[in-house]
Amino acid sequence: MISLRHTALGLALSLAFTGQALAVTTIPFWHSMEGELGKEVDSLAQRFNQANPDYKIVPVYKGNYEQNLSAGIAAFRTGNAPAILQVYEVGTATMMASKAIKPVYEVFKDAGINFDESQFVPTVAGYYTDAKSGHLLSQPFNSSTPVLYYNKDAFKKAGLDPEQPPKTWQELADYTAKLRAAGMKCGYASGWQGWIQLENFSAWNGLPFASKNNGFDGTDAVLEFNKPEQVKHIALLEEMNKKGDFSYVGRKDESTEKFYNGDCAMTTASSGSLANIRQYAKFNYGVGMMPYDADIKGAPQNAIIGGASLWVMQGKDKETYTGVAKFLDFLAKPENAAEWHQKTGYLPITTAAYELTREQGYYDKNPGADIATRQMLNKPPLPFTKGLRLGNMPQIRTIVDEELESVWTGKKTPQQALDTAVDRGNQLLRRFEKASKS
């Protein structure tokens, strides 16, 4: 009987110790990467998990950027937030003002892991840095700039030089007419119209998007993208639209699919769209810089980043935060950051990742792969071309989409639409300013 008891006790202790040995800290990571990008996120997580058996990063696709941000905030309010939330760049002010985050530099400090914030490319890191402390609040992950993708085969058919994409918007308008005359149904389409046609158009041409240096200097900023230069640009696109040379295909990244399917000869889209274009395009394509306005003195200036960063959510235990810190450290290692850059088309987020990519000969073997980086570093940023930090910016983008759509459908003139977008957007800015002071 005693022997049986000892055996049972020994078995129980053995199972208990086995359970402790097998205890794994699960770390949910909500993101918006789909297609080839999602596969690469899964690959990074799997490799981290294999090297760190005490932790399990669980990537979960939660829809597009807006949907993921909304889901993350809603989950935080009910106590069910993920440990890591990917948030697009225009959600930065919203996340900073929320009580939902644990600053990334604190996560590393508490975990006892050395975190060199200077390793990140300054233009990228500046977007996510707290002006008061000078520390990173979130970790840059998939940063991008808009680039021009063009169908070299279609260029040849239209009698255009396949190695010379249009450099200015005026040239692009001429090219689209020739491409359409040569039989292309769609000469040009644009993804993310607010980000590319107003936010980046403004920065690339050395124009402010909003006062207070685009909101970096205070929450009392007002929108300023209804000035003559921006109105003229939207008018050019509307003129192309009436001729059938510019096709509006959606608010997000729909134009990328239209491009790699061969429907559209050119598109401006995120540099991060390269992964899907590389996978699905069945023709020769090239990558060029964003066009600039030939009539604006000093253009082009510098591009501002899009994409997203990784935010750490409040309310987790110490072991979870230690695992998060290890995973973020893993992502920033030169070999991993360089691979992410090379496979996706997103910018190298660290200087070491850029240098490693260059040393590996990647840019020599893949002409155009460094376009996004060169645009970002084209000229030292002006105070109002280093990015945007405006409250309620996701909602302002929706307003911009609505008003631009009223231009493409002929309901409003470019001036009317941009004036209305500025007025409606400023109401949201005042609401955010009031809430941030309460």
From Swiss-Prot:
One of its GO terms (biological process) is transmembrane transport. CDD domains: PBP2_UgpB. Its main location: periplasm. SUPFAM superfamilies: Periplasmic binding protein-like II. Residues 1-23 form the signal peptide. The keyword rRNA processing does not apply. Keywords: Periplasm, Signal, Transport. Disulfide bonds: none annotated. Pfam families: SBP_bac_8 (PF13416). InterPro entries: Bact_solute-bd_prot1, SBP, SBP_1_CS. It is found in: Periplasm. GO terms for cellular component: outer membrane-bounded periplasmic space. Sn-glycerol 3-phosphate binds at Y65, E89, S144, S270, G307, Y346, R397. Part of the ABC transporter complex UgpBAEC involved in sn-glycerol-3-phosphate (G3P) import. Binds G3P. Belongs to the bacterial solute-binding protein 1 family. This is sn-glycerol-3-phosphate-binding periplasmic protein UgpB. The gene is ugpB.
